[in-house]
Structures are given as C-alpha cells and as structure tokens.
C-alpha cells in the first residue's frame, strides 16, 4: 500500500496547495512548514508553467511569479528536500502540467522520489484511451515508485474508469458536476457510483475556502483541497505565520 493510500486510512484529510517558487525557494519551504504546522495532512506543490490554463487567475499569477523567481526543475528538488528536512511524514504531491515534465527523463523522476515526492498529478495528461494502450509517462512514474494521481469527473464513463484503474494509485481526484456539487444527495450519489469502480480514496477537487464548505465536502469525500485561499494569503502577507492560522481556520475540528 502506498504512503498516500495509507494516510487516508487514518482519517479524512486536508490537502494544501502552494506554487513552488512563488516568493522564492526559501519562502516556499517556510510556507510549507507553516501549512504543516497548521494541520495540513498532504502538501501539493505546483510546478510552475507559463500557460496554466486549468487554473484560476490567482493561481495563474502565482505561476508567473514563480517563473520570475527562476524556479527550475533543480530548485524544485531543493524545495522538496528543504521540506523533508523539516518533516518526513506528511506526503508530498507534485502538481504539474505535462509540458514542464515532458523533457524530464526517468532519472529526474527518480530524483523527485528520492527527494521526498510521493505522487504526481499531471492535470492535462489523461490515462490511455483504449485497453492495451500504454502511457510511457505513467509507466515511468510507477517504475520509480511514484503514485500517478489521476482525475475523474461526473462525465467519466464506466468504460473510461476501467482504463483509469490501470494506472491510478494513491487516491483519485474527483471533479463534481456543477449541477449537483451543492446538493449533498446528488454528490453523494456521484461518489457512490465512483466507489463501485475504485478501492482508492476519492477526494473532491473543488477549491475549498472555509471550514463550512470543508465540512460539507467531508460528508462524502475522503478529503478536500485548499488552493486559492493559501496562494492568496501568500500575496497578502509575507509572514508565514498567517498561513498556519489560516489553515487552522479552514480545517474542521
């Protein structure tokens, strides 16, 4: 059982997001420490990209700031190692678009693993479209011991889920239907159908901003993720202590 799957066995979890390099290498390390101290159970680090179209404007700007700080694949490793020097237990996920990882070879993926990354979520790289088709990148992740964190949605068919099963490890991100996301009955039914196909933990991918919304999501999801609220806080106040306080106000007691 992977470390990510194992940690979900203990409780329902909060995943906290930071864009790596936003504010500089040292700041990202200190911000990560602050979120962990605030109670974040899993940390997701965004690999900056020049065209992060799947993210909202505030997250996109954080990518721009990180690139302006000259965040590279090597300084990303330094950030991961810096976080691991502080905490060896909290799982770390790399969130990326495929382009920044496209030219990285198996050795770099192995270095990510050795530095302390546990899983990789590539937002714009789907699982293969047919049985028998292979995904070289997902194969490489598995070869070095990194969990591919895949995404499914309300529109994912049972046939498509069977293809995703081949590579999904750690947990799954679920993107709910807009029409049912605020209906507890509707969203619970969506999750029930997904759980018929997967033994993995399933996390609602919507971007949580407060404790009430987090508590609602935890009624049916194995966890929740906070992205924009944490990124916004880093732009409002360079003091990382405020991140600890913010995490404590978002995570249900």
Curated annotation (Swiss-Prot):
GO biological process, one term: L-tryptophan biosynthetic process
Pfam families the UniProt entry points to: Trp_syntA
EC number(s) given by UniProt: 4.2.1.20
Biological or metabolic pathway of the protein: Amino-acid biosynthesis; L-tryptophan biosynthesis; L-tryptophan from chorismate: step 5/5
UniProt xrefs under InterPro entries: Aldolase_TIM, RibuloseP-bd_barrel, Trp_synthase_alpha_AS, Trp_synthase_suA
Reactions accelerated catalytically: (1S,2R)-1-C-(indol-3-yl)glycerol 3-phosphate + L-serine = D-glyceraldehyde 3-phosphate + L-tryptophan + H2O
Matches recorded under NCBIfam families: trpA
Purpose of the protein: The alpha subunit is responsible for the aldol cleavage of indoleglycerol phosphate to indole and glyceraldehyde 3-phosphate.
Protein's name in the database: Tryptophan synthase alpha chain
Organism of provenance: Chlamydia trachomatis serovar D (strain ATCC VR-885 / DSM 19411 / UW-3/Cx)
